[in-house]
Amino acid sequence: MTSECRDGVAGLRSARTAAFTPIVKRAPQIAVIGERHASRSLLRDAEDVGRELARRGAVLLCGGMSGVMEAAARGCAEVGGLVVGIVPTAEAQDANDYVSVPIVTGMGEGRNIIIVRSAQAVIAVGGSYGTLSEIALALRLEIPVIGLHTWVFSRERPDERDPVVRVTTAAAAVDAARKAIND
């Protein structure tokens, strides 16, 4: 390869890299997942997580519906945060009232993969089987999972560490998610 050709290829690489560099610094995208029929205690936790995410400049991703999703969205929206709801139905109006940006999928629970793939970290607050599927997807994709009163996993090998970072408060959940993103 001639030096002229090498210089041209190097220039193309630089241009391509520059083309994919965001103009603005993107806010971290953190998903909050959890059950639709949650206890008051879990709903308070979820609302606190949403509030903490907004205060720290993160975008909250959620399923956009009721329960933990709505509580987290409410907490985030009430302090001016951005809430993106990945809605399982094909209608934007199905999203809860606190969702800033509804993304309609018409995919039912299949939208769980979109929530997880779009997140840099996942905070699970409580959870039913849908939450369990999202946790499993995140772990398989090596996306950090922070657990606030959520599923506990058991393996045959007791020396293997828990793949979920366990916390007991909303602030600790957001701290752990931000740390996982920055590590």
Stretches found by the model and what they are:
Residues 80-88, 101-104, 144-148, 166-167:
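Short hydrophobic/aromatic-enriched beta-strand-loop microsegments
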Residues 16-84:
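Glycine-rich beta-alpha loop segments
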Residues 34-37, 109-173:
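C-terminal binding/interaction regions
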Residues 177-183:
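Short, hydrophobic alpha-helical segments
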Residues 65-66, 88-91, 150-153:
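Short, ordered loop/turn segments at secondary-structure junctions
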